[in-house]
């Protein structure tokens, strides 16, 4: 989906370019709706010089490199989800106690939350109306990073 070319794919898989071309051809054949989405997004980036996240945020695309448009939409939408989740979690914790200590890339770190709050925060972070569900991993520790356990 990130528009990797056969040369880069072959290198990453330590394979031959013809094998990578075959893999890509089979992938696009198996998932024509993804191929259509990729082609349309690249075309829009090239034609308009911009694309939009699923939330409508505009992202500029260099018309000389329109293939980046797909990744921009995917990563931009993920960033939007993170910002929305951060706002929702902050609002919830302000009303119910606890703090957001920090964010690291696509993670939120919390302090002073009750274990009973974890399921609600988990729900807040996954609550998006996409045709495909969003999954969020939740780890918890009372002491340190070394003691993290999946919830």
Task: Label every PLM stretch briefly.
Residues 1-151:
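Conserved catalytic core of nucleotide polymerization and phosphodiester-bond processing enzymes
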């Amino acid at each position: 989906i990130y528009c990797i070319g056969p040369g880069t794919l072959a290198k990453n898989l330590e394979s031959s370019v013809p094998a990578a071309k075959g893999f890509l051809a089979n992938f696009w054949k198996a998932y024509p709706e993804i191929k259509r989405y990729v082609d349309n997004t690249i075309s829009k980036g090239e034609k308009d010089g911009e694309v939009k996240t699923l939330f409508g945020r505009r992202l500029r695309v260099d018309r000389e490199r329109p293939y980046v448009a797909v990744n921009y939409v995917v990563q931009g939408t993920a960033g939007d989800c993170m910002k929305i989740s951060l706002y929702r979690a902050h609002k919830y914790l302000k009303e119910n106690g606890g703090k957001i200590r920090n964010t690291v890339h696509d993670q939120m770190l919390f302090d002073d939350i009750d274990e009973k709050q974890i399921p609600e925060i988990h729900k807040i972070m996954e609550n998006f109306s996409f045709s495909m569900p969003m999954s969020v991993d939740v780890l918890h520790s009372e002491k340190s990073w070394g003691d993290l356990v999946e919830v």
